[in-house]
Amino acid sequence: MRFLIVTGLSGAGKTQAMRALEDLGYFCVDNLPPVLMPKFAELVAHAENKIEKVALVVDVRGQKFFQDLDWALGELTKLGIKYEILFLEARDEVLLKRFKANRRGHPLGVRGSQILDNIKKERKFLENLRARADKVIDTSDLQPADLRNEILNYYGEEQKRSKISINIVTFGYKYGLPLDADLIMDVRFLPNPFYVKELRPLSGSDKPVYDYVFNYEVTKKFTEKFLDLIEFLMPFYQKEGKSNLVIAIGCTGGRHRSVAIANFLARTLEEKNYEVYLRHRDLEKHREE
């Protein structure tokens, strides 16, 4: 039985994660009190109709919650039930924006308290639990569909895969590093189409920009060597039990060079029969500024 505990910061996307897990065939329970977790796990393990995958969504509700959860996790271990923890988080300003958009109060809020103060308080409460998590997803820059795809990718066919899946994400250094990246490659050393007037409004997904970037010998040599490195590392990551490799490709704004390189890598790795997922995190951000 796969026993997954979904937790994290309020507003980080636990509801969307649960819906994705349900689509994967998980038996999902929302807001089960931690003190009931060991008994629930026993009942599920010995159910007449065998349940293969279980996901419990656990929210913060106060200091006693953490004492109860710590006890419950210890009891699960005593019962021989192997569990995994998925922790969802987001940046403070993103969580604040979500709470205001939904016009909801924070679970830790009391009359007169500020949402941002409660977010910081909850983050502090959850530090130790986050450190114990098997998987941490930062949803700050993810749309609901992106989070769903990440859940489906990581928890879907993991046990059946013979190869690691590869997530390639592009980003702009001016917007910050992706927090979940395993490998980060800085491609700001490549010639920059931004300084070519007719190419500036385009992206690395447009042929003129792509051709400009790959017209240079340094680009061809770099991508050849980087592909060699990725393929060299894959069997070692697989040997240690890794099922998903996140490769982040960054340039200044995340629009030209990183996108062109990532598109090339994704296409080439797919041709080599790797399972590849591609996302351009900051591609549209210039339109919002």
UniProtKB/Swiss-Prot annotation:
Transmembrane segments: none
Gene Ontology MF terms: ATP binding; GTP binding
Binding site for ATP: G8, L9, S10, G11, A12, G13, K14, T15
Record keywords: ATP-binding, GTP-binding, Nucleotide-binding
Gene3D superfamilies, alphabetized: P-loop containing nucleotide triphosphate hydrolases
InterPro entries xrefs: P-loop_NTPase, RapZ-like, RapZ-like_N, RapZ_C
SUPFAM superfamilies with a match to the protein in the record: P-loop containing nucleoside triphosphate hydrolases
Residues engaged in binding GTP: D59, V60, R61, G62
Source domain of life: Bacteria
Pfam families linked to this entry: PapZ_C (PF22740), RapZ-like_N (PF03668)
HAMAP family: RapZ_like
UniProt-listed PANTHER family: RNASE ADAPTER PROTEIN RAPZ
Role: Displays ATPase and GTPase activities.
Family according to the record: Belongs to the RapZ-like family.
NCBIfam families on file: PRK05416.1 (NF003828)
Protein name per its UniProtKB record: Nucleotide-binding protein CHY_0272
Species assigned in the record: Carboxydothermus hydrogenoformans (strain ATCC BAA-161 / DSM 6008 / Z-2901)
